[in-house]
Amino acid sequence: QNMGAGKVKRISRGFRATTIMGSIYSVVFGVLVFFFGNMLTGLFVSENLDQIVGLVDIYMKCVALFFIPLNVVNVYRNGIQGMGYGFLPMTAGIAELAGRGLTAVVASHYKSYLGICLASPVAWIFASALLLAMYFGIMNKYKKAGNFRE
């Protein structure tokens, strides 16, 4: 709606506000998952198997540290798609796949559980970097064209 009306500045403010809100949410829940995530394991594991609980705790800590890039992926992928650019966000999915696959190959070569746990965060970083570059490229295009108004 805003894109069709040429209200690119309003879109920019929406992206900024959503990114800030999502980042606050990411920090709050990242801290909760980092420090209390092991308690959640009991909901899914019928027995208190120390080895499983320990491995899940490592995984939860790894992903909790990267909730902000995950937020960026969710906000910018959907936002760019909503601006009418359907193909660009799909390429971020390819970047995620590449990041996850590359990390898994390297981690499995070194038999690193920690590396496997970092596969999703690496994917989120790859995709968020690509999506941010796309977003700023799109916005610069509208600024240069003089379409950056309320």
What do these predicted ranges mean?
Residues 67-93:
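Membrane-interface junctions at transmembrane-helix termini in multi-pass inner-membrane proteins
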Residues 8-11, 83-97, 101-103:
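Cytoplasmic juxtamembrane regions at transmembrane-helix boundaries
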Residues 26-34, 71, 75, 101:
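Hydrophobic positions within alpha-helical transmembrane segments of bacterial inner-membrane proteins
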Residues 75-79, 101-106, 132:
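Alpha-helical transmembrane segments of multipass membrane proteins
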Residues 1-65, 107-150:
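Short alpha-helical transmembrane segments in multi-pass integral membrane proteins
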Residues 23-24, 70-72, 82, 98-99, ...:
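Short hydrophobic/aromatic segments of transmembrane alpha-helices and their interfaces
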